[in-house]
A protein has these predicted regions:
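Exposed acidic/Ser/Thr-rich ligand/metal-binding surfaces
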Residues: 2, 7-225, 286-287, 369-372
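Short structured motifs
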Residues: 10-15, 212-213, 259-265, 279-280
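OB-fold and OB-like beta-barrel modules that bind single-stranded nucleic acids
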Residues: 28-30, 278-279, 295-297
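Solvent-exposed residues in well-ordered beta-strands and their adjoining turns
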Residues: 32-34, 231-233, 281-283, 300
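Short aromatic-acidic-glycine turn motif
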Residues: 234-244, 302-306
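Extracellular adhesion/glycan-binding regions together with long Ser/Thr-
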Residues: 246-272
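Low-complexity, intrinsically disordered segments enriched in Ser/Thr together with acidic residues
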Residues: 269-288
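Long, acidic serine/threonine- and proline-rich intrinsically disordered regions
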Residues: 282-412
Length: 412
């Protein structure tokens, strides 16, 4: 039935100049559940996979245990939950079950002690097994994966397990606590599974709020298996696609082909848009109104037993010889483009720094102006050949991918 999701777009310029050459056009596409879905609450099939190695000793483990108990308290009886711990072995301390015996579950959490090394794949295997134990109709299947260290010799196995999770409809949401975890691996695990890049828990005391956000994200899921397609007419090609909300993520070349762009969006959460910025190249056109793309969103509404629902929208621009008309730009779209570019360049600086201990990429003032003072100062240190901490590296990456969550600096 219609009305569960809105599909909207904005273009960088509604009026483009008639020229003799090809031109770049930005299209910002947004998908969002409607108010019709505001009261939807699908059951959760949740596993928390927790590193309890020796390096978790003290405040980190203490705060994580309190955060896990908070999650248990907030689950509904229709939710299933399990908890797996790992060091260089793994153990299921709460097998997957309905969230009924909360005192018993929390007592089991209190018994977790720090010990051993870090072999993350063992925890992931047990976690996936727990999620597969039950067939729960319409459930949101999700793994929260927390670690504070570098896994030992099993990174490729972790990546393959993330692919296996995606095939089973299980999204992994990694959390890194402290400064010593492998952000490249955790980001990849999250993205390969259809989840998110790693969230950085900078201070142990932040664990409670981060776990609360993760739980709320799962509770808010209303639409599943969402895919955005842009179909392009002759004379229009796609150069780049970047997810810009809820975070910035370069989608790479795999989503692009000659005549269409196919972008898996996964779950849509209530009141939270997912937005994609697509850069198109348009061949010369005479004056007039032209369609430069057709957008299509396919999605499932599990609560209504609907699969493969579709909505479409035409993206049009006017080519004009009026210089005043073609000079106008959409500030909102260009703000997203500016921040996506800032994320790309900062990511390049961090990659260079992690690889060589220095960076040759320099950021222009129009890039640095959208960054906070801490990030600017750390990047300046890198440019001057100085070292920054692993904590700063993780903080910069985490904050830069969230630049678009703050759009109050739009220039009209």
């Amino acid at each position: 039935m219609p009305g569960e999701v809105t599909l909207a777009h904005e273009v960088g310029k509604d009026f483009m100049p008639v020229t003799g050459g090809s031109q770049v056009a930005y299209v910002l596409v947004e998908a969002r559940p409607t108010e019709m879905m505001a009261q939807v609450r699908m059951p959760l099939n949740f596993v928390l996979v927790l590193d309890h190695s020796g390096s978790m000793k003290g405040a980190k483990l203490k705060n994580v245990k309190e955060a896990v108990k908070m999650v248990i308290d907030r689950l509904e009886p229709t939710d299933y939950v399990s908890v797996v711990i790992f060091d260089d072995t793994s153990q299921v301390i709460i097998p997957s079950m309905p969230a009924n015996d909360k005192p018993g579950m929390k007592a089991a959490i209190d018994q977790i002690r720090d010990a051993g090394g870090t072999t993350m794949s063992l925890g992931m295997i047990q976690g996936l097994n727990e999620l597969r134990r039950w067939h729960i109709p319409n459930a949101v299947n999700r793994m929260i994966l927390l670690t504070d260290g570098v896994t030992y010799g099993d990174s490729d196995r972790c990546r393959q397990l993330a692919r296996d999770a995606a095939s089973a409809g299980i999204a992994i949401y990694p959390l890194g606590i402290g400064a010593d975890w492998d952000e490249d691996l955790l980001d990849t695990v999250g993205q390969l599974s259809g989840g998110m890049p790693a969230e950085f828990i900078r201070n142990a005391t932040d664990a409670l709020s981060i776990f609360e956000q993760q739980l709320q994200s799962a509770v808010d899921v209303a639409i599943r298996n969402t895919t955005l397609i842009l179909r392009l007419p002759v004379g229009v090609s796609a150069k780049k696609a970047v997810k810009v909300l809820p975070i910035i993520s370069d989608l790479g070349q795999s989503v692009l082909s000659d005549r269409q762009v196919v972008i898996p969006l996964g779950d849509l959460e209530k009141d939270k848009p997912q937005s994609v910025l697509v850069e198109l190249m348009i061949d010369p056109r005479p004056a007039g109104l032209f369609r430069i793309a057709q957008t299509e969103l396919s999605y499932d509404v599990p609560i209504a037993n609907l699969e493969g629902e579709k909505i479409r929208d035409d993206v049009k621009v006017t080519f004009t010889t009026d210089a005043n008309q073609s000079a106008a730009v959409n500030a909102n779209v260009m703000n997203f483009a500016e921040k996506a570019n800032a994320h790309r360049l900062v990511t390049r600086v961090l990659e260079e720094y992690k690889r060589t201990g220095k960076a040759t990429t320099r950021l222009a003032p129009n890039v640095t102006r959208v960054l906070d003072e801490e990030t600017q100062a750390a990047l300046e240190q890198i440019n001057q050949g100085q070292q920054i901490s692993q904590e700063q590296v993780k903080s910069i990456g985490n904050k830069t991918r969230k630049l678009t969550q703050r759009l109050d600096d739009v220039v009209p």
